[in-house]
Amino acid sequence: MASKGPSASASPENSSAGGPSGSSNGAGESGGQDSTFECNICLDTAKDAVISLCGHLFCWPCLHQWLETRPNRQVCPVCKAGISRDKVIPLYGRGSTGQQDPREKTPPRPQGQRPEPENRGGFQGFGFGDGGFQMSFGIGAFPFGIFATAFNINDGRPPPAVPGTPQYVDEQFLSRLFLFVALVIMFWLLIA
């Protein structure tokens, strides 16, 4: 009887011990599926998981790219708290093969790509500036490209004349003459 009591009491303990271990295995298996960490940037299973001091979990490659693209404003992508390479903690799980700090591994930089130059075609070699041909469309004396002409954008004209030279005096005279003509035309439009 005494031997039955301990064996009987051992049996429930074994079954209860087996139950939790069995349930923990079952929970571990189902928890294994649910216990994968998701990166808050790519929303995929975190590779080389790191956790920020504010409690958000990321893949190290994703967080590294986030920090590299914003060197002046390093904030957590989720809560905008301050974050840096030194303010994240690597996570190591059971069964992980490598115990190397993921912060020591820097993802490879993407290869640069040079786009092909565009084919200008058309008017090359005809003496139109640098090979391009420009036109300004407008109605009468009011071109639609007024900002392009006023700010000398994409223009192949020579620089203005140096003050004091005869060319400068001639340009000033022509400028005033055309201003006077423009004012006369505008006055005529107002009274007509």
From Swiss-Prot:
<comment type="subunit">
    <text>Interacts with ATG5 and BNIP1.</text>
</comment>
<feature type="region of interest" description="Disordered">
    <location>
        <begin position="1"/>
        <end position="30"/>
    </location>
</feature>
<feature type="topological domain" description="Mitochondrial intermembrane">
    <location>
        <begin position="152"/>
        <end position="171"/>
    </location>
</feature>
<comment type="pathway">
    <text>Protein modification; protein ubiquitination.</text>
</comment>
<keyword id="KW-0862">Zinc</keyword>
<dbReference type="InterPro" id="IPR017907">
    <property type="entry name" value="Znf_RING_CS"/>
</dbReference>
<keyword id="KW-0808">Transferase</keyword>
<keyword id="KW-1133">Transmembrane helix</keyword>
<dbReference type="GO" id="GO:0044322">
    <property type="term" value="C:endoplasmic reticulum quality control compartment"/>
</dbReference>
<feature type="region of interest" description="Disordered">
    <location>
        <begin position="90"/>
        <end position="123"/>
    </location>
</feature>
<keyword id="KW-0479">Metal-binding</keyword>
<keyword id="KW-0863">Zinc-finger</keyword>
<dbReference type="GO" id="GO:0043130">
    <property type="term" value="F:ubiquitin binding"/>
</dbReference>
<comment type="function">
    <text>E3 ubiquitin-protein ligase that regulates selective mitochondrial autophagy by mediating 'Lys-63'-linked polyubiquitination of BNIP1. Acts in the endoplasmic reticulum (ER)-associated degradation (ERAD) pathway, which targets misfolded proteins that accumulate in the endoplasmic reticulum (ER) for ubiquitination and subsequent proteasome-mediated degradation. Protects cells from ER stress-induced apoptosis. Responsible for the cotranslational ubiquitination and degradation of CFTR in the ERAD pathway.</text>
</comment>
<dbReference type="GO" id="GO:0036503">
    <property type="term" value="P:ERAD pathway"/>
</dbReference>
<dbReference type="Pfam" id="PF00097">
    <property type="entry name" value="zf-C3HC4"/>
</dbReference>
<dbReference type="GO" id="GO:0008270">
    <property type="term" value="F:zinc ion binding"/>
</dbReference>
<dbReference type="GO" id="GO:0006914">
    <property type="term" value="P:autophagy"/>
</dbReference>
<dbReference type="InterPro" id="IPR045103">
    <property type="entry name" value="RNF5/RNF185-like"/>
</dbReference>
<dbReference type="GO" id="GO:0006511">
    <property type="term" value="P:ubiquitin-dependent protein catabolic process"/>
</dbReference>
<keyword id="KW-0472">Membrane</keyword>
<feature type="zinc finger region" description="RING-type">
    <location>
        <begin position="39"/>
        <end position="80"/>
    </location>
</feature>
<dbReference type="GO" id="GO:0060340">
    <property type="term" value="P:positive regulation of type I interferon-mediated signaling pathway"/>
</dbReference>
<dbReference type="InterPro" id="IPR013083">
    <property type="entry name" value="Znf_RING/FYVE/PHD"/>
</dbReference>
<dbReference type="GO" id="GO:0051607">
    <property type="term" value="P:defense response to virus"/>
</dbReference>
<feature type="region of interest" description="Required for ubiquitin ligase activity and protection against ER stress-induced cell death">
    <location>
        <begin position="29"/>
        <end position="80"/>
    </location>
</feature>
<keyword id="KW-0391">Immunity</keyword>
<dbReference type="GO" id="GO:0055085">
    <property type="term" value="P:transmembrane transport"/>
</dbReference>
<keyword id="KW-0812">Transmembrane</keyword>
<keyword id="KW-0399">Innate immunity</keyword>
<keyword id="KW-0256">Endoplasmic reticulum</keyword>
<dbReference type="GO" id="GO:0005741">
    <property type="term" value="C:mitochondrial outer membrane"/>
</dbReference>
<dbReference type="GO" id="GO:0044877">
    <property type="term" value="F:protein-containing complex binding"/>
</dbReference>
<dbReference type="GO" id="GO:0061630">
    <property type="term" value="F:ubiquitin protein ligase activity"/>
</dbReference>
<feature type="transmembrane region" description="Helical">
    <location>
        <begin position="172"/>
        <end position="192"/>
    </location>
</feature>
<feature type="topological domain" description="Cytoplasmic">
    <location>
        <begin position="1"/>
        <end position="130"/>
    </location>
</feature>
<dbReference type="GO" id="GO:0044390">
    <property type="term" value="F:ubiquitin-like protein conjugating enzyme binding"/>
</dbReference>
<dbReference type="GO" id="GO:0044314">
    <property type="term" value="P:protein K27-linked ubiquitination"/>
</dbReference>
<dbReference type="GO" id="GO:0045087">
    <property type="term" value="P:innate immune response"/>
</dbReference>
<dbReference type="GO" id="GO:0051865">
    <property type="term" value="P:protein autoubiquitination"/>
</dbReference>
<keyword id="KW-0072">Autophagy</keyword>
<keyword id="KW-1000">Mitochondrion outer membrane</keyword>
